[in-house]
């Protein structure tokens, strides 16, 4: 065999093998590599998206915590205000009740004083009548009575 014929035959076989490899072997390998690269890129994109979602979720958590703290502060302030208002209302009610009790006691004391005065007047009147009766029984003197009446008349004028 001739060296040139062998070389040409090897070249033909090489080109057929290269063509066969390029036509049937290389495309599935390239396709598999492209799919693998795409999966890796998708995985990296998903990881980036997950990072972004995690950062967004963390921001939302921080915001919700801030809102919850603010809301708790508002609730606490409202409760303190309501408690203060209830205390003020209770004090006002107690003051009103005390004032009513004081007024009732003063009215009762005034009524008792009035009753005592009337009872005292009645007693003084009874004593005066009794004293006058005793005086009149004891001494009936027309001249003394006339003098008394004259003195009374002068005092009244």
From Swiss-Prot:
Q: Which Pfam families match?
A: ATP-synt_B
Naming one, the record's GO cellular component terms include: proton-transporting ATP synthase complex
Compartments, as annotated in UniProt = Cell inner membrane
Annotated InterPro entries: ATP_synth_B-like_membr_sf, ATP_synth_b/b'su_bac/chlpt, ATP_synth_F0_bsu_bac, ATP_synthase_B_chain
Q: Which GO terms describe its molecular function?
A: proton-transporting ATP synthase activity, rotational mechanism; proton-transporting ATPase activity, rotational mechanism
The entry's keywords: ATP synthesis, Cell inner membrane, Cell membrane, CF(0), Hydrogen ion transport, Ion transport, Membrane, Transmembrane, Transmembrane helix, Transport
Topology within the bilayer? Single-pass membrane protein
Q: Record's superkingdom?
A: Bacteria
Bilayer-spanning residue ranges? 7-27
The answer, when asked if Ion transport is one of the entry's keywords, is: yes
Q: What does this protein do?
A: F(1)F(0) ATP synthase produces ATP from ADP in the presence of a proton or sodium gradient. F-type ATPases consist of two structural domains, F(1) containing the extramembraneous catalytic core and F(0) containing the membrane proton channel, linked together by a central stalk and a peripheral stalk. During catalysis, ATP synthesis in the catalytic domain of F(1) is coupled via a rotary mechanism of the central stalk subunits to proton translocation.
Q: How does it assemble?
A: F-type ATPases have 2 components, F(1) - the catalytic core - and F(0) - the membrane proton channel. F(1) has five subunits: alpha(3), beta(3), gamma(1), delta(1), epsilon(1). F(0) has three main subunits: a(1), b(2) and c(10-14). The alpha and beta chains form an alternating ring which encloses part of the gamma chain. F(1) is attached to F(0) by a central stalk formed by the gamma and epsilon chains, while a peripheral stalk is formed by the delta and b chains.
> Can you tell me which family this protein belongs to?
Belongs to the ATPase B chain family.
Q: PANTHER family from the entry?
A: ATP SYNTHASE SUBUNIT B (PTHR33445:SF1), ATP SYNTHASE SUBUNIT B', CHLOROPLASTIC (PTHR33445)
HAMAP family assigned: ATP_synth_b_bprime (MF_01398)
Q: What's the name of the protein?
A: ATP synthase subunit b
| Gene name tied to this protein | atpF
């Amino acid at each position: 065999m001739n060296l040139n014929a062998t070389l040409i035959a090897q070249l033909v076989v090489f080109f057929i093998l290269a063509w066969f490899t390029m036509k049937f072997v290389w495309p599935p390998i390239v396709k598999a590599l492209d799919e693998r690269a795409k999966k890796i890129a998708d995985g990296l994109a998903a990881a980036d998206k997950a990072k972004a979602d995690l950062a967004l979720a963390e921001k939302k958590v921080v915001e919700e915590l801030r809102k919850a703290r603010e809301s708790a502060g508002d609730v606490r302030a409202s409760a303190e205000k309501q408690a203060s208002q209830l205390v003020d209302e209770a004090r006002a009610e107690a003051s009103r009740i005390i004032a009513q009790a004081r007024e009732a006691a003063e009215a009762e004391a005034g009524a008792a004083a009035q009753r005592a005065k009337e009872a005292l007047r009645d007693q003084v009147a009874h004593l005066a009548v009794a004293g006058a009766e005793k005086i009149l029984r004891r001494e009936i003197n027309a001249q003394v009575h006339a003098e008394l009446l004259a003195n009374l008349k002068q005092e009244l004028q």
